[in-house]
Amino acid sequence: MSDIAERVKKIVAEHLGVEPEKVTENASFIDDLGADSLDTVELVMAFEEAFNTEIPDDAAETILTVGDAIKFLEKNAG
């Protein structure tokens, strides 16, 4: 697992208060991890801060799963 993937999973587990083992790449923030729309906005902001990057609104709307976040950040962070 990449460093980015590990960091994303840790951020998601901490922000949503879920067990780390539930945070899989296929897990939907809303359907599987119990997030609401405010949680997803807060997650995007946490990713931006942790990875020192900006996630445009149109891109943020496509980040629906843990794997989506990892793929976006692997391509755009740093």
From Swiss-Prot:
Q: Tell me a Gene Ontology molecular-function term this record carries.
A: acyl binding
Q: Which Gene3D superfamilies match?
A: ACP-like
Pfam families, sorted? PP-binding
Q: Can you tell me where the transmembrane regions are? A: none
Its GO CC terms are: cytosol; membrane
Enumerate the Gene Ontology biological process terms: lipid A biosynthetic process
Q: What does this protein do?
A: Carrier of the growing fatty acid chain in fatty acid biosynthesis.
* NCBIfam families reported in the protein's UniProt record: acyl_carrier (TIGR00517), PRK00982.1-2 (NF002148), PRK00982.1-3 (NF002149), PRK00982.1-4 (NF002150), PRK00982.1-5 (NF002151)
Q: What is this protein called?
A: Acyl carrier protein
Which species is listed as the source? Answer: Azorhizobium caulinodans (strain ATCC 43989 / DSM 5975 / JCM 20966 / LMG 6465 / NBRC 14845 / NCIMB 13405 / ORS 571)
Gene from which this protein is expressed? acpP
